[in-house]
């Protein structure tokens, strides 16, 4: 268990034990269906406060080898799925909130360097006996771990597009960041699933060709994920009807 690699599921525990939680765990039936396929690249584009980070934490808790989430998920819909145990907590799961790295660094070089060093520390702590070709290279080290363990990675990148909002006019910084994402994720057999969240669709940043392996799901085109992201009218009505919620409204 690390800070970024194979987290312990406590974030999702806190979410599910809060006053309001709407069960969106059936999204995992979709992510399970695309694991290690060409459809394994998913980008969710929604405005703020639409539960993107909550869903990302749910995915991390379900796949992470850093915890046993059977009891945590047992009250929810995904637990009734026949494949619930097949994929649960079986993957090296990397959770990156890019806003966290952005707020602690001054430029894109510092951001990527800090992120790589922190993830590499987690990786080497979890797999100290792997024969790393270059233990300062994150992408190669992930491939080395996969080759020796046959355990692929689920990579979750929350707020992937915050770099574009911070460096609006810095095309070089944007290209460096995109090059990193492409090199890390594209055509890599060690990646079982890549799940990114952002505010605007990839094409809005003029970068669609660099990340053209991703399927995008937005408010306008939610596709098969329509009922899993955001809230339906019935879900909103059910929450308003709860006593704790009525007290807040009044």
Enumerate the predicted regions with their spans.
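Phosphate-binding site recognition
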Residues: 1-248
């Amino acid at each position: 268990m690390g800070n970024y690699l194979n987290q312990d599921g406590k974030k999702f525990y806190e979410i599910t034990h809060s006053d309001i939680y709407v069960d969106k765990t059936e999204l995992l039936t979709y992510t399970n269906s695309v694991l290690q396929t060409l459809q394994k690249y998913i980008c969710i584009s929604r405005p703020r406060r639409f539960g993107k980070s909550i869903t990302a934490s749910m995915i991390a808790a379900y796949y992470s080898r850093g915890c046993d989430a059977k009891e945590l998920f047992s009250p929810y819909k995904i637990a009734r799925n026949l494949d619930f145990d097949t994929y649960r907590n079986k993957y090296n799961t990397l959770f990156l909130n890019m806003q966290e790295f952005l707020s602690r660094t001054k430029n894109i070089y510092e951001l990527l360097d800090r992120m790589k060093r922190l993830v590499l520390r987690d990786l080497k702590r979890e797999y100290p006996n792997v024969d790393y070709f270059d233990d300062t290279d994150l992408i190669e080290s992930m491939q080395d771990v996969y080759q020796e363990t046959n355990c692929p990675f689920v990579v979750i990148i929350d707020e992937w597009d915050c770099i574009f909002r911070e460096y609006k006019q810095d095309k070089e910084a944007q290209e460096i960041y995109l090059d990193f994402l492409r090199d890390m994720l594209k055509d890599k057999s060690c990646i079982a699933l890549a799940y990114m969240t952002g505010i605007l669709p990839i094409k809005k940043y003029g970068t669609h060709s660099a990340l053209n392996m991703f399927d995008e799901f937005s408010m306008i085109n939610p596709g098969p994920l329509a009922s899993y992201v955001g809230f339906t009218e019935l879900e909103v009505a059910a929450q308003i009807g709860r006593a704790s919620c009525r007290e807040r409204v009044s």
